[in-house]
Amino acid sequence: MFIDRAKIYVKGGDGGNGIVAFRREKYVPDGGPSGGDGGKGGNVILEVDPGLKSLMDYKYNIHIKGKRGEHGQGSNQHGKSGQDKVIKVPPGTVVKEATSGKVLADLVHEHDSYIAAEGGRGGRGNTRFANPKNKAPRFSEDGKPGEEKWIVLELKVMAEVGLIGYPNVGKSTLLSQVTKASPKIDSYHFTTLNPNLGVVELEEGSRFVMADIPGLIEGAHQGRGLGDQFLRHIERTKMLIHVIDIASIEGRDPVLDIETINEELKGYNSRVMDKPQVIAANKMDLGDQAEENLQRLLDKVNSDEILIPEQYKKIFPISAATGEGLRELLDFVAEKVAQLPDTHDTFDIDLELPESEENTDTEQEALFTMSQDDKIEEKPKSDFGIRKEGDIFIVKHEKLEKILNEIDVHTEKGRHYFQAKVDEFGLEEALVDKGIKPGDTVKIGNVEFEYQ
């Protein structure tokens, strides 16, 4: 599952109260004030954890609060500050205001952090208010409430593998074959104007994000065609698959294409040439010309007649249309990607996600999320106690609460099981009857989630 959006409520801890207290001292009115200040409330802090890959945790745990500061004490003892609540997010998380959509933070690198909600200031004890006119004040100050708001977390996609090559060499077809993405494919130059992304998942558990980079032409590094905008996308990947039309369907020489594209990469930024790259000789299913061109390419590469980086000398004959050779290519790329360090560079665009037998989630749809648009089949009627407090619908249902106490909904199996029970008991139907709207919160036992 790849969840890339979550809406959460954050609240800094309230400040502790200052107190009224007096010490015992001869000739001093009431012994003199000695009320300590309250402690500051804890902040809610977002911090990048490179080990995280999704916003899964915040689909179920949407109310996050800092600890309250302790109250002051006598003898001018100040209350202890409340503990900060540090929540971990994956690299590439963008923080936005829920109402305006204003970007508050862009968390990319390890240990990047952002204070999402400030803790409240501690209240002042009566000692703070003593003055020549009032040497024994009998009042103090309460702590200030912590900052509170709804924020949206959005995870920008990190593409590990980029598909490069001339227009119409089959990059979009390759992406759609191996990731179940659905790029728009037409036979004219610059078909792909923005990178399309998809997730490649292999049986043994290997997984990486692949991006179809907009097509190149000669002179791109000087601004021709799509110019620098596609070259910047290339910089963000771990490695590249250079797709060529080995059958020369459009009359171009695939060997010359490789040299031309290399010159464009080198002209833009020589460091791009240091990225691991392999050649995918596509359209091998289209006749003898493909076989002849492949042999010519292999001969030139092996004899060093064609000046290409060493990493380009790994050539995979494939057909994106028929699937020929794709497994060998993907196995090699998956192994290489696992060995390479993360770039922490991101694509701020939508992600096409694959379907699997266990999970058919899409970009903003978690397994546990109930959608208004889903058709509800007839289910056994079940009695729910549902009451509304603000925008929170509190559900009382003995069996569902019992299930939540017995399973861990943070595991995939737990979520599958609980979602099945939610459907079985017809909870969504009952909530719709009560007037629930997208964005409202549903609470069952101690578990809260957002209705979408």
Curated annotation (Swiss-Prot):
The keyword NAD does not apply. Its cofactor is Mg(2+). Residues 66-87, 117-143 are annotated as: Disordered. GO terms for cellular component: cytoplasm. It is an enzyme of class 3 (hydrolase). GTP binds at residues 165-172, 190-194, 212-215, 282-285, 319-321. Residues 376-452 form the OCT domain. It is found in: Cytoplasm. InterPro entries: G_OBG, GTP-bd, GTP-bd_Obg/CgtA, GTP-bd_prot_GTP1/OBG_C_sf, GTP1-OBG_CS, GTP1_OBG_dom, GTP1_OBG_dom_sf, OBG_GTPase. Keywords: Cytoplasm, GTP-binding, Hydrolase, Magnesium, Metal-binding, Nucleotide-binding. Mg(2+) binds at residues 172, 192. One of its GO terms (molecular function) is magnesium ion binding. It comes from the Bacteria. GO terms for biological process: ribosome biogenesis. HAMAP family: GTPase_Obg (MF_01454). An essential GTPase which binds GTP, GDP and possibly (p)ppGpp with moderate affinity, with high nucleotide exchange rates and a fairly low GTP hydrolysis rate. Plays a role in control of the cell cycle, stress response, ribosome biogenesis and in those bacteria that undergo differentiation, in morphogenesis control. Belongs to the TRAFAC class OBG-HflX-like GTPase superfamily. OBG GTPase family. Monomer. This is GTPase Obg.
